[in-house]
């Protein structure tokens, strides 16, 4: 009975959050909800549809895309293909891939990819450099200079208009961080991947509910856009924890820096199959 009660409560909460639709807290105070293609309201539709937003962002901010990669030979070429397709001013978008001591063909593939992508910078780290993923991200943070940092996993898959949606929401909404909703690309593989897909969907509903209640969402590592000055004020990425995304969420909150959720388009990643 307790399990059934909990399921009903959580299910009802998720349903009510979904039906409420629009996340008004993600919009600037003077904006008006616009409609997506399915007729529902969303903050990203409001911002993307407002010509004043595009005009005010005639000078788009510099963005650094940062990826920590260890033994990612299976996905690194696809990653760069997607990043190369992003619709954003080329002179204001830089990619940093930190080869974190890879022992497969990742280093060779990155060498082959560099001539194809002029904005690609590769940082090499020894496998025992320490700090884990956070250490790799901090290495890129120290060498880059963009106003905004987009953190992706090597298997992260984003759409070509991702930055066109992310940046207006972040800038016009006065957010210090924007987390993309996470989704799974291989959900139908087996029970384990389906469970992970369900977990990500439910987590997104919880984050949306927090925002609708006037709160903030949490950062989730893959697919997070961060303001550099706030990130640096927080001391960068914490190398002494394995839950660096949750740690950073708390440190942003302690700084008074607000974070929100981008519902569409999501960042997609591969679920663990075994």
Question: What would you call each of these model-derived segments?
Answer:
Residues 81-127:
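Acidic donor-binding segment of Leloir-type glycosyltransferases
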Residues 61-64, 94, 232, 247:
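Cell-envelope/extracellular polymer assembly enzymes that use nucleotide-activated donors
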Residues 114-126, 130-147, 160-242, 253:
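Long helical/loop segments within the catalytic core of UDP-sugar-dependent glycosyltransferases
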Residues 101-103, 155-158, 183-185, 225, ...:
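A short, conserved beta-strand element in the Rossmann-like catalytic core
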């Amino acid at each position: 009975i307790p399990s059934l009660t909990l399921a009903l409560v959580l299910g009802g909460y998720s349903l009510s959050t979904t039906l409420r639709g629009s996340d008004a807290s993600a919009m600037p105070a003077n904006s008006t909800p616009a409609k997506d293609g399915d007729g529902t309201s969303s903050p990203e539709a409001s911002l993307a549809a407002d010509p004043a937003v595009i005009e005010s962002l005639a000078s788009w901010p510099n963005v650094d895309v940062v990826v920590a990669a260890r033994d990612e030979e299976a996905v690194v070429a696809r990653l760069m293909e997607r990043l190369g397709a992003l619709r954003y001013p080329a002179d204001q978008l830089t990619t940093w891939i930190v080869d974190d001591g890879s022992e497969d063909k990742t280093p060779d593939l990155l060498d082959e990819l560099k001539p194809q992508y002029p904005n690609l910078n590769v940082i090499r780290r020894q496998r025992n450099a320490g700090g884990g993923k956070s250490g790799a991200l901090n290495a890129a943070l120290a060498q880059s200079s963009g106003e905004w940092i987009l953190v992706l996993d090597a298997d992260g898959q984003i759409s070509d208009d991702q930055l066109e949606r992310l940046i207006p929401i972040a800038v016009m909404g006065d957010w210090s961080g924007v987390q993309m909703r996470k989704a799974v690309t291989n959900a139908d593989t087996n029970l384990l991947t389906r469970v992970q897909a369900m977990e990500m969907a439910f987590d997104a509903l919880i984050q949306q509910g927090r925002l609708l209640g006037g709160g903030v969402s949490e950062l989730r590592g893959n697919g997070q856009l961060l303001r550099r000055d706030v990130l640096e004020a927080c001391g960068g990425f914490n190398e002494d924890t394995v839950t660096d995304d949750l740690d950073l969420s708390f440190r942003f909150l302690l700084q008074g820096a607000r974070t929100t959720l981008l519902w569409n388009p999501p960042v997609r990643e591969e679920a663990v199959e075994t």
